[in-house]
């Protein structure tokens, strides 16, 4: 370029060309590893510089600053931090599966702690790293000028190890990126040996040896589909999960604990512990009492102590979903092949390594053959000298000078200049008989070596055999057991229920359609005849209509006055720890039509084929349908029963074919008949007569009447009693029934009736939202509800305020 000469250029072309030059520089000279030695330029330069400084595994450590300075000054004209960071990573046992640098000092931690400054740390090569540099002085690789043309540096290392797959690689170039996982050296050596013997083998054959990635931090890989995809195409997703187990009370001597001993690759342990603690503190994951990091020099150990009611599997499922206890490793096996970025599958990557090692051994053999032939040439001259010793000594003695002696030797004995010079350089002590035998022996050995090397170079199969021998040697010396376990079961997408612990809930629904759930433990047990606790601040003209107890995993079936059924999960109902919270409008959960309201709700744990759903209307109609018909209720609901005019559905229960049911009316009548009296009907059909009602009487409730149980009846005035099921005669359906409660003004009409046993507790709710939780029956009649005959009035079980009334009750088992 001539100074002062101005040449106009197109700015678009210049930017395009400059950016392309930059992109190719990043791709080829910075971000991507070479398929042959698996190294990026910065790693290659660090290892070569350390070898050049003599920092081998059996020498003393030297300051890291010295290494960084050597690399910067000779080979890598970039920032010192880039060189030091790359060297540090090669010394971290949680970053590389097989470390290449042996560091002394603080080289960082799995908690994300930074390493100490380079002036404080020391390093040397590991023994394994020496295998990457073996035979580099035997013309095995090409050298190129360094950045200022003052030195030469290798374009690739003659690595005896398949480093690309052994330690993996990651890097972001321009418009592309690589992310290759590490693998087990033993498996790689076995796979490459098999590939050499069976070059036409398929992916399945290779995967008999290479099971999958083997991360330095261990962990679990879920499923083989992602691995197979990555090995077949070069792209894939591998799901990695932490190794954790649940320690019971006998093991810990305290509460149950989840103990994490291995983390997914590249997960920051300190950040993980903080994340778990935050999720627990914000109540996004319940059941965790404390999180502790107990890691020490013996290994990693994170302890999650559970609360008494914490369910380990649900907590683990939540942690897998919301934290880095489960991560995805996205495989992109991109590497440089002949300085071009190429996505490789497993077989291609292994084949490139085999071809590279063939080239290295061939070049080494040619170098050694050339040296052996040169030495044989010298030894042939020395042999001639030994065979003509007296004549040669006499010739040298009478020669005018060394040049004359050399020329006469070459002329008289037909020697080359090198041979003649070697004879002149021969020490007198080499003329002894023993030394003569050494020269002859060395000559014979050299001839054998030449023959061997010539045969080796003429036979590629023997070169491949040497590749296998090298692999067997490195496998025996450096091979180890797999750290990452591969589980055959793939990733299971967590359903919402998998993340929610089983918990008993009180579900309430008001007349105006506000629904909520509250944990049952919010309500402490009380004696009968108490005033109860308020469970809701009802609005004016609103009151509690239904109350029931359900598990968070139960399906809540909601029945409407029009005979429709809706289904929601209990955990989908908003939960509030405040008893007095009003809840959410039911219309936000199910699409009720105008003037449609919920008239009954039940909780279902399983939708069995053998069980039936028995429904009843206020007018005394009953219907039996298979429960399994309602296992999948669409969001818009289903028609459960075709109702007579001016009738409405008031309740439903689950019963077996050999059981009996009982209907209870507001005026205190009841009928007890077999389920078998009701034929199984289709979902949208109508019902049959269950009980014949008199006057304005309506059905208040129904339940399954099991032997040894009691019929519990509670009135609007707060009166209640227990009556043995056996006191109710078994009748045929459609009769008028028998008396079950003597209704008078002070008791009020029957609000609800259910079948209970001694182990039950009941939660009785009033219209104003007051609830009392009381045992059904104990030996102490002052605490439990009294057992009485059918035609009695019962005793006070709750004292509702004036202008308040009992509306319903729910049963539960402690």
Curated annotation (Swiss-Prot):
Residues 32-499 form the Topo IIA-type catalytic domain. One of its GO terms (biological process) is DNA topological change. Signal peptide: none annotated. SMART domains: TOP4c. Gene3D superfamilies: 3.30.1360.40, DNA gyrase/topoisomerase IV, subunit A, C-terminal, Topoisomerase II, domain 5, Topoisomerase, domain 3. GO terms for cellular component: chromosome; cytoplasm; DNA topoisomerase type II (double strand cut, ATP-hydrolyzing) complex. It catalyses: ATP-dependent breakage, passage and rejoining of double-stranded DNA. Pfam families: DNA_gyraseA_C (PF03989), DNA_topoisoIV (PF00521). NCBIfam families: gyrA, parC_Gneg, PRK05560.1, PRK05561.1. Belongs to the type II topoisomerase GyrA/ParC subunit family. This is DNA gyrase subunit A. It comes from Dehalogenimonas lykanthroporepellens (strain ATCC BAA-1523 / JCM 15061 / BL-DC-9).
